[in-house]
Amino acid sequence: MGNIVVITGASSGFGALTARAVADAGDTVYAGMRHTTGRNAPQVKAAADYSAAHGVDLRAIELDVGSQDSVDAAIGRITAEHGRVDVLVHNAGHMVVGPAEAFTPEQLAELYDVNVLSTQRVNRAVLPGMRARRAGLVVWVSSSSVKGGTPPYLAPYFAAKAGMDALAVSYAGELARWGVETSIVVPGSFTSGTSHFAHAGRPADHTAEAAYEEHYAGLMDQVAEKLAALAPEGADASLVSDEIARIVALPRGERPYRVHIDPADDGSAEVSDVADRVRRAFLDRVGLADLLTVTP
């Protein structure tokens, strides 16, 4: 019997690729997205066409991670049809580019909502069922920016992803005794194959943005060019989706706590190794080493 898998933000990029990769492995996949009867209607059709052409079970579903009502309705429908959700992939996110000062506090709050609070909405809908069954997997799509090299003009996005990663780390320990596994997937700076940069938001304070542009002329273009140049040939976004599919397919108890897919090698893996080692040592010191592995 295959897994019932929910993927947020699955209209494009890592989400859409992951939905197809996991469905190809034989699982039933719900590709969550907004505006399924509007702007994302072509993506709904694309998912249905892929499902029919490849003989897999891939279904688009209306799931707006910014709305608890939408999340509850989607998870309620899936649970009514299958009785459970086995795997949840937190992929939904949004990026902004520009000088940090030029973003309003409200813009930072909106970004935090999409990248962090959205995971809490979905968790509150999905985790009660996983806890009741003492089984499940939560995959968090983080970012190498959390612990790796951080170029300028991406500060609000980096801060939000750091918040998401911190939440994932805490959830890992809190869910372990419930038998629910956590895997944190850390992509590097994939500048192609995703819609992050193409759909990135801009600062609302155009005066401040213009001042920075005058003083640091062309800096954002330089950052984009350098990030693209760091990635070796063949560094396709499917590396991330294929790794998520591999993790989902692993037997319970063998799924990794954290994995890096960073062809540019920005140092995130090295720093994460230290942080994760400190986490393990600390939990052992305070007598909570059992939280490092799921309870059968």
Model-inferred region functions:
Residues 99-100, 107-109:
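Substrate-binding pocket helix/loop in short-chain dehydrogenase/reductase
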Residues 11-12:
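Conserved glycine-rich cofactor-binding loop
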Residues 38, 61-73, 105:
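The beta1-alpha1 cofactor-binding region of Rossmann-like NAD(H)/NADP(H)-dependent oxidoreductases
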